[in-house]
């Protein structure tokens, strides 16, 4: 009898544990819902579906919306589908933007059933951690991770906090505190340090930063894993401090190629993987990282990103890959190597077919995952015999430097992706996005990621639904605007970097070509007109639409006026020159005012968030300088690469440069003398350096109108002002 009682208890315990395990995903999905819509928690019910294949279902049962999924990630995707297509709402990836849905939840007619077309959905780029995320706290990360889950992402790049791991490794190797922290760059530059592009720039990195990032990464990884994601952590790819040569003089350490015009003092060093020291460092790093962060056995290793390897000999490259992989599996037998393929595109003349094959086949089959990084431009799977059968992920990049240009051949990219899913081979394992920054419209990434699921939504319906959820209702004028954007404006492969106001002024320089567009600005003006006919600007997504389209129209028009200004310089027409100059200044002023209507279109948030990272006035100033530096002068030859169309930055930085340029040429033409170009450039550089090193700025928030119709009124006013001027 006693044995029977024990047996019964054991069975009940096992059943209880099984039930708990089954319900864990439901609890996670409910917690996500509570974070987004706490008032609606009783209106939804989540159910666990059987099966390994990612899938979700949505149906109405009595007075509840019932969402099923095989795991919490699939349930989140199902929740987002309901919010998008039934509640007409867009969940922002920004933490401060509330989710707006109808008071009475719409019922679901026919049951929705969807299954994933690919197993892996990847997101992020090393650069995103510099251009968008360096000052993020847990609040920002929590919303962003929820956004990733809502869009079905299950393999995010997760590189926060790795400097703390490296600090432990280099300390054990015999380096001093100041040597190690001086080897690191300033916070927003860490992505390029991690990719072995630059060392030491804006260092030394404060110890407080390292400690903060460890705490943050633990929260990030816990939440990502909770939502059924497999974070991609870093591994050792050969990048070592120059000071290591002092401790290990016999080590095979060589210089990597120079990068982006940086001086030799910032050049990176590479340890040959066949040196015994390489395996030692790899094991130290992975062991220390596992202690802090655990592992999902997928590691990002990216040697030679935008820099030349010590040799391009195929046998050398094959051996490098083979030796590097051997050190990885010696430390973690389950390891898989994830490699971005940007270098094959960026240095396509150097990375010949033979060289690419050598690197890719140096790793055993199915042990290297390739990110086909920039597929909207070049699909490398077509040039590499399907990556020589190694697994790969088709990725849409869509943005460089985090600037907000309306660019990206979105519709064409969708067609390319559909073709890849049919003809890309059995080793196409996933879909992803590798955007450099988030200061862009969300919709291209939502569009691409949704194609990972068999939802059978055609482009016309998709764009109509997008328009509806941005404005919060069915508005024909907004639908027309979005159809034009999708079919006629978003047709250009991402190559432009912002608009001309964000570039250092120069007479007849190629910056005009870099900011030009294939569409007519008159077409975009018509989009703006239709948006201004919307019934309301209450929804945040629509407010961003108004600002983004409006500032692009003004930015494009500024280019036209500037080219006219340069022609008047050559014609020596003083009166016409003055008129053009005043017009340019006026456009810049209007741009600043338009951007001031949204906190994410303002310099204030970027600087405030940077300063909040510091616990002392000195640290606050240090972080602010780094924040100012990245979005302006950057470093090396990358001046203005990360330009932003932000209120405050336009008035206090870009406009100041343009005023000097305009006034200098007006004065010179009026006096009948030539402009000293060297002196002009020196004056502009003085403005730039002074601004980067300053800690005072205009508070643009006092200019922001908080009324719900303020932006729409101002946008309509600007449209009326410029509609007859834009050609």
Locations of the language-model features?
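C-terminal substrate/ligand-recognition segments
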Residues: 514-535, 547-570
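C-terminal amphipathic alpha-helical interaction region
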Residues: 561, 566, 577-727
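Hydrophobic h-region of N-terminal signal peptides that target proteins for export
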Residues: 12-20
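Contiguous, structured surface segment used for ligand recognition
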Residues: 21-118
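Active-site-adjacent substrate/metal-binding segments within catalytic domains
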Residues: 118-137, 148
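Catalytic-core regions of glycoside hydrolase
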Residues: 41, 89-90, 96-105, 124-128, ...
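Bacterial N-terminal signal peptides that target proteins for export
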Residues: 1-8
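Second-shell loop/turn segments in exported
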Residues: 64-69, 130-134, 207, 312-313
């Amino acid at each position: 009898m006693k044995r029977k009682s024990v047996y019964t208890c054991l069975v009940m315990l096992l059943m209880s544990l099984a039930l708990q395990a089954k319900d864990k995903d439901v609890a996670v999905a409910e917690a996500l819902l509570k974070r987004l819509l706490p008032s609606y928690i009783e209106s939804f019910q989540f159910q666990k579906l059987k099966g390994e294949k990612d899938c979700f279902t949505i149906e109405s049962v009595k007075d509840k919306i019932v969402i099923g999924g095989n795991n919490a990630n699939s349930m989140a995707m199902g929740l987002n589908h309901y919010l998008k297509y039934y509640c007409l709402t867009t969940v922002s990836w920004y933490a401060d933007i509330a989710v707006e849905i109808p008071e009475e939840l719409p019922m679901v007619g026919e049951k929705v059933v969807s299954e994933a077309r690919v197993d892996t959905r990847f997101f992020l780029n090393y650069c995103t951690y510099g251009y968008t995320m360096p000052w993020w706290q847990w609040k920002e990360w929590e919303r962003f991770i929820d956004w990733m889950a809502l869009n079905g992402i299950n393999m995010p790049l997760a590189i926060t906090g790795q400097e703390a791991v490296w600090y432990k490794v280099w300390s054990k190797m015999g380096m001093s505190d100041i040597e190690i922290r001086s080897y690191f760059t300033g916070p927003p530059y860490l992505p390029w340090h991690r990719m072995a592009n630059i060392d030491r720039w804006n260092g030394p990195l404060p110890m407080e930063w390292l400690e903060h990032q460890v705490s943050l990464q633990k929260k990030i990884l816990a939440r990502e894993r909770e939502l059924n994601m497999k974070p991609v952590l870093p591994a050792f790819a050969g990048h070592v401090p120059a000071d290591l040569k002092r401790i290990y003089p016999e080590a095979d350490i060589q210089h990597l190629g120079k990068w982006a015009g940086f001086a030799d003092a910032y050049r990176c060093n590479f340890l040959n993987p066949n040196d015994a020291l390489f395996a030692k460092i790899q094991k130290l790093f992975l062991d220390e990282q596992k202690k802090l962060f655990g592992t999902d056995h997928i590691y990002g290793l990216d040697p030679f990103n935008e820099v030349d390897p010590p040799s391009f000999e195929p046998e050398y490259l094959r051996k490098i890959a083979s030796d590097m992989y051997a050190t990885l599996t010696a430390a973690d037998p389950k390891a898989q190597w994830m490699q971005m393929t940007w270098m094959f595109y960026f240095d396509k003349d150097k990375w010949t077919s033979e060289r690419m094959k050598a690197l890719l086949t140096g790793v055993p089959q199915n042990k290297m995952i390739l990110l086909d990084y920039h597929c909207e431009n070049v699909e490398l799977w077509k040039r590499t015999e399907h990556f020589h059968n190694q697994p790969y992920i088709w990725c849409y990049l869509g943005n460089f430097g985090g600037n907000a240009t309306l660019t990206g051949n979105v519709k064409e990219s969708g067609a390319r992706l559909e073709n890849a899913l049919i003809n890309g081979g059995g080793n196409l394992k996933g879909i992803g996005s590798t955007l450099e920054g988030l200061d862009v419209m969300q919709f291209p990434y939502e569009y691409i990621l949704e194609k990972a699921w068999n939802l059978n939504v055609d482009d016309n319906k998709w764009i109509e639904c997008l328009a509806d959820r941005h404005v919060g209702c069915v508005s024909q004028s907004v639908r027309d605007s979005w159809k034009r954007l999708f079919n006629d404006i978003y047709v250009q492969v991402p190559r432009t970097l912002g608009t001309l106001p964000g570039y250092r002024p120069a007479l007849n320089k190629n910056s005009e070509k870099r900011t030009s567009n294939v569409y007519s600005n008159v077409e975009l003006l018509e989009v703006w007109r239709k948006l201004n006919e919307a019934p309301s600007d209450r929804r945040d997504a629509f407010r961003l639409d108004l600002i983004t389209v409006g500032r692009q129209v003004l930015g494009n028009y500024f280019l036209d006026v500037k080219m006219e200004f340069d022609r008047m310089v050559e014609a020596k027409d003083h009166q016409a020159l003055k008129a053009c100059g005043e017009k340019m200044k006026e456009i810049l002023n209007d741009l600043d005012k338009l951007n001031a209507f949204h906190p994410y279109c303002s310099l204030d948030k970027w600087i405030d968030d940077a300063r909040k990272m510091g616990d002392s006035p000195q640290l606050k100033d240090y972080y602010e300088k780094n924040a100012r530096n990245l979005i302006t002068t950057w470093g090396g030859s990358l001046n203005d690469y990360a330009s932003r169309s932000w209120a405050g930055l336009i008035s206090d930085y870009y406009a100041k440069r343009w005023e000097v340029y305009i006034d200098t040429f007006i004065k010179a033409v009026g006096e009948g003398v030539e402009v000293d170009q060297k002196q002009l450039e020196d004056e502009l550089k003085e403005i730039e350096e002074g601004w980067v090193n300053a800690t005072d700025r205009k508070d643009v928030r006092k200019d922001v109108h908080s009324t719900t119709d303020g932006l729409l009124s101002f946008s309509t006013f600007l449209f009326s002002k410029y509609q007859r001027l834009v050609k």
